[in-house]
């Protein structure tokens, strides 16, 4: 049908997973970037949608690691594709992103990305849209934004005083940090 569909059912969830991140060493830069951007979008979007839900604390832990690993290692791996440590970090981050969507659903950026896949890859389309939804959702997701903004500040993507901001101003600061991350990775 040409339509992407998400099927989640206990019958198709394996009892164990095997991860061999070494297989990514030969992956082209575009595939590496798109996979990492999609994985970080999973974590970011589920984190936003988890506010007030029973699994929020668990999602916060998952998102903290997934987002930090992608923001820290994607630019490095794109500069040095043979960086095994970076590839392992990105593999773990995207696996955490996959785990995130088992906890809760994605939202605006993923939904909008499907309208853009004729001109952009899915991961890049999500990365393009996430800053906009970050600002849009900001008043309702201040806790997640402080988490993401803190990671961005720690990694040098923003100099804003994240803890002093709230509402739209916080959303704008985090959105600008997300854009700075994409730019540092050399992606449009």
Residue ranges and their predicted role:
Residues 4-5, 9, 29-37, 56-64, ...:
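Amphipathic, non-membrane alpha-helical segments in soluble helical-bundle scaffolds
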Residues 95-126:
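Glycine-rich phosphate/pyrophosphate-binding beta-alpha loops
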Residues 37, 67, 109, 126-127, ...:
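A general structural signal for well-ordered alpha-helical segments in protein cores
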Residues 123-188:
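Gly/Pro-rich interdomain helix-loop hinge
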Residues 1-54, 146, 150:
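A glycine/threonine-rich phosphate-anchoring loop and its flanking beta-alpha core
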Residues 41, 51-55, 113-117, 128-141:
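Glycine-rich flexible loops
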Residues 33-96, 100:
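C-terminal and late-domain segments of enzyme folds
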């Amino acid at each position: 049908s040409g339509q992407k569909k998400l099927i989640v059912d206990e019958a198709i969830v394996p009892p164990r997973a095997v991860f061999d991140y070494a297989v990514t060493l030969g992956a082209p830069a575009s595939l590496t970037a798109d996979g990492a951007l999609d994985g970080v979008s999973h974590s970011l979007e589920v984190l936003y949608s988890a506010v007030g839900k029973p699994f929020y604390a668990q999602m916060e832990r998952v998102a903290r690691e997934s987002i930090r690993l992608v923001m820290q290692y994607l630019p490095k791996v794109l500069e040095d594709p043979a960086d095994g440590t970076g590839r392992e970090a990105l593999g773990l981050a995207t696996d955490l992103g996959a785990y995130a969507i088992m906890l809760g659903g994605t939202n605006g950026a993923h939904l909008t990305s499907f309208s853009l896949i004729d001109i952009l890859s899915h991961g890049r389309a999500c990365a393009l849209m996430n800053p906009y939804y970050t600002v849009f959702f900001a008043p309702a997701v201040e806790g997640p934004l402080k988490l993401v903004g803190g990671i961005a500040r720690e990694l040098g993507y923003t100099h804003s005083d994240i803890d002093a901001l709230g509402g739209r101003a916080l959303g704008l600061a985090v959105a600008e940090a997300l854009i700075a991350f994409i730019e540092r990775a050399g992606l449009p």
